[in-house]
Amino acid sequence: MSDSIKRVVLAYSGGLDTSVILKWLQVTYGCEVVTFTADLGQGEELEPARAKAELMGIKPEHIYIDDLREEFVRDFVFPMMRANARYEGDYLLGTSIARPLISKRLVEIARETGADAVAHGATGKGNDQVRFELSAYALNPDIKVIAPWREWDLTSRTALIAWAEQHQIPVPKDKRGESPFSTDANLLHTSSEGKVLEDPWEETPDYVYSRTVNPEDAPDTPEYITIDFERGDGVALNGQAMSPATLLAALNDLGRKHGIGRLDLVENRFVGMKSRGMYETPGGEIYARAHRGIESITLDRGAAHLKDELMPKYAELIYNGFWFAPEREMLQAAIDHSQANVTGTVRLKLYKGNASVVGRKSPFSLYSERHVTFEDDAGAYDQKDAAGFIRLNALRLKLLARQGR
């Protein structure tokens, strides 16, 4: 199709869709394909992707399977969590935050292998196409991006399978029928969308949940844990130091056991439509609650409230694919500055779908028991001072009232 494209780096999972894309690139563009498979903690065995790529003629040296779990949590998830980011107040951005890292590595591999373009398997209806491509262009403005779902005429699962069989691409038997929903997973979350979930009135069937037990079936006894923070990032669980990815994985196990982190959500996509998704973020939900807990005693009121005002914009930037944009980096600098004293320990109670902060302590705590006590404060606070404070703040309200407004 294009003489200018000789080699393409494909974000490759080894599944049916990206295997069809791999062959389609070879047939349509007549180009060499380099495959890249990211291990983001999705819990799948990734070596079959290597075997399948080799079966489809990819040179061993052009098959990249990279373990990005630590980088993902350290450089993407934790910075986002410092902001307490939740898109539209609920969504912990598990899919959104993974895309810039995948794009970053795609662009790096393209540079390493001398590729002319990168390709992804995101559809033309969703947000991921935007996230992949905005990130790629931010890192390399001259990169070419191929989005097969916007180019080919394969408009159904049946057509995809027929094309695969025509080109001798192995089709697993469980892929011949329509899947009742589609999923995306990484160390932070699992998302499920489509088919059985498209009616927002219908409750999500139990079989959709893969990462958490039903809260009703969770243990009848609560479990208490502690998370240690240093400068806004988690560093230990129950007193045991852990790397970022190891900590999140351990929290995932706890969250799964106690049915924590389920979210049934109708959200506003960047491309303009509403979509219904079911998210499971067990460890991320625990971590987010804990981070809020340690901030509650270490952040000044003004800083805390300003962070809360900035958070929706920060979350929207990530959701819409602007991780590498200057405005996100500006907000990140402010957020990171706020975390200088966000150090200490949070105790949480895990019980039947809930992660409740029940204790917090910090060497930088701004909480003064002496000032808030209901007992004798030994002169720490003169309650008579409140009268002047109220009088000044009431002045404008009195003036408005006297004008009948």
Curated annotation (Swiss-Prot):
GO terms for cellular component: cytoplasm. It is found in: Cytoplasm. ATP binds at residues 11-19, 38, 121. Its EC number is 6.3.4.5. L-citrulline binds at residues 91, 96, 127, 131, 182, 191, 267, 279. One of its GO terms (molecular function) is argininosuccinate synthase activity. Keywords: Amino-acid biosynthesis, Arginine biosynthesis, ATP-binding, Cytoplasm, Ligase, Nucleotide-binding. It catalyses: L-citrulline + L-aspartate + ATP = 2-(N(omega)-L-arginino)succinate + AMP + diphosphate + H(+). PROSITE patterns: ARGININOSUCCIN_SYN_1, ARGININOSUCCIN_SYN_2. Pathway: Amino-acid biosynthesis; L-arginine biosynthesis; L-arginine from L-ornithine and carbamoyl phosphate: step 2/3. It comes from the Bacteria. HAMAP family: Arg_succ_synth_type1. Belongs to the argininosuccinate synthase family. Type 1 subfamily. This is Argininosuccinate synthase. It comes from Sphingopyxis alaskensis (strain DSM 13593 / LMG 18877 / RB2256) (Sphingomonas alaskensis). The gene is argG.
